Amino acid sequence: MLMLAGCGTVMQTSVDFVRTAVAGKDDLSEAATKVAALPYASLLMDDGQYRAVMVLGNDDEGRLSWHSRQAVVFLCEGGVLCGTHGLRAGLDDARIEGDNPFTDLRTVGEAGITVSRRYDWRSGYRYGVPVTGQLRRVGQESVADPLGRSRTLARYEERLEGPGVEGTNTYWVDPATGVLWKSRQLAAPDVYLEINLIKPYRRRSQ
């Protein structure tokens, strides 16, 4: 089951502040501009039915929880989606088995590699669903972020196959820094989350 760890004081402050700063009547471009001016990691998330500006609420040993002002949450680790709360996907958990190339996608070339995952979905009580991904770099392209800033990013595609699952994840990565600025990731069969960074998270050194 998806577990939401308690936010640290600073991160809880960021969530509370953004809920106050971003009014319900704000359009998303205005909300993104407001949030970008704040000293908090932030992004724009869209699952095809729900779209929101979100801020980082917690870092649980690298598993990040992102929160909207409507209390919708999704979790990711290394930029890879691993859980949702309050979204139609109903993803309790997703985990990579074996080597994790998403710690630095720049190590993946055009020849590609195989990624093994398991998904846990509440709908239909589908837990431990094995999914295999074929991940490779497919080129570079110019990508605009939610503030209209354009970057030339490396594009990676991951073709997914498993019982009742077929689809493609797409990732756009800064070839110089390795920052995953944009992605479109499977959250459930036929449900994708599109994630666009506004301000990346800089983890403090321990």
Please name every model-derived segment:
Residues 4-6:
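C-terminal motif of bacterial Sec signal peptides marking the signal peptidase cleavage site
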Residues 99:
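Acidic/charged, solvent-exposed loop-and-adjacent secondary-structure segments enriched in E/D, K/R, S/T
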Residues 103-105:
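Terminal, intrinsically disordered low-complexity segments enriched in charged/polar
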Residues 8-94, 112-206:
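Acidic, serine/threonine-rich low-complexity disordered tracts
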